[in-house]
Swiss-Prot record:
Its main location: secreted. Residues 43-93 form the BPTI/Kunitz inhibitor domain. It comes from Trichosurus vulpecula. One of its GO terms (biological process) is lactation. This is Early lactation protein. It is found in: Secreted.
Length: 102
């Protein structure tokens, strides 16, 4: 009798884990879909220097030339078209450009 109850509990917990994993997968898929909607708008923004006094080398995606370009970020404000590295800028905006053109 104890074995049957333990087996039943184990089976129910496994079913619960599978359902939880499916829910997490669904949440991840929705997050990626929402991100892919957000990325194009970020990449279409002009470079946003901001209004502080620092001069930090950053990259923005120039939607006209379809390239990532260097700009000096002031350290505050600005906008989302602001990447720490050329690689990050290219991966975010160029990949999305090709996805939208197909």
């Amino acid at each position: 009798m104890k074995f049957t109850i333990i087996a039943l509990c184990l089976a129910l917990s496994l079913v619960g884990m599978t359902s939880s994993e499916k829910l997490l997968d669904r949440i991840r898929a929705n997050s990626l879909e929402n991100l892919s909607r957000l990325v194009p708008s970020l990449c279409l923004l002009p470079s946003g220097r901001g209004n502080c006094d620092s001069q930090i080398l950053r990259y923005f995606y120039n939607a006209t030339s379809h390239t990532c370009e260097v700009f000096l970020y002031s350290g505050c404000n600005g906008n989302g078209n602001n990447f720490d590295s050329l690689e990050c800028c290219l991966k975010t905006c160029r990949l999305n450009k090709y996805r939208n053109n197909n």
